[in-house]
Amino acid sequence: MKPAQTQQVRLDIIQNILSVAGYSAEDMKGKSPADIIDLYEKKFEVLLIDKNNTPVQRSEMEKELQTLGYKEAELAEMKTFELLEVYNAKLKLLAKRAGETVEQYDKGIKVVYLYKPEGEIKYYIIPIEGNGLWGMMYGYIALKTDLNTVAGIRFYKHIETPGLGAELAKPSHNEKWIGKKILDEDGKLVSVKVAKGDAEQSHAQEIEHYVDGISGATLTAKGINEFLKADLQTYEPYFKTRRQTEETQQPAGEVE
């Protein structure tokens, strides 16, 4: 990928992370790409964790990629989400060099964006992705510090029909998710689901876990419901640990 393309992809990702944290198009108006990236750098902390809920340093990935010929300076220039993408793309080769299968070698490293506008964590943001009707969909979901309440959601990349894509991008659709809960009363992960039609009519008793459906998008909604819960489940061990930390009144800005 050419430098200009790389920069644009980076900017798009950062803008979507800012968007799910609550920054509007009006907030971004007049800001240069450098200003937007600087805002991201100042307001977010990027945390890497493995499948065992253990923090991972980006230097660990950098060292492994250097064994494949990547230059230290080249890797240092990458944002953490870019580094993780390269690392995951090279897992098969890294595993082969280590004499292991991908399943044995893969640490299951994933990213959490900690939104800290005033120094303490306000939102936890994670990437979400999975199959819609016509192909992969990508987005982000933001959770408040109770790691239960949805603060925002954005779908930014997909190949669904143009009309559906426009509907998914509308602030009015995203606002439907705000305040919804991913846990039931017993603390079990149930996620948030897109209903068929009016959520109030079909799921009045579980309205905290449902949003209104989109006309003509039943199969897309089914895909969203499946991959959103699966992605939240992947992060649930980490979220559970953080909830316990919050309950013991440890400062929210303190990250293990």
For each feature predicted by the language model, list its residue ranges.
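Flexible, solvent-exposed loop/hinge segments and secondary-structure transition points
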Residues: 1-256
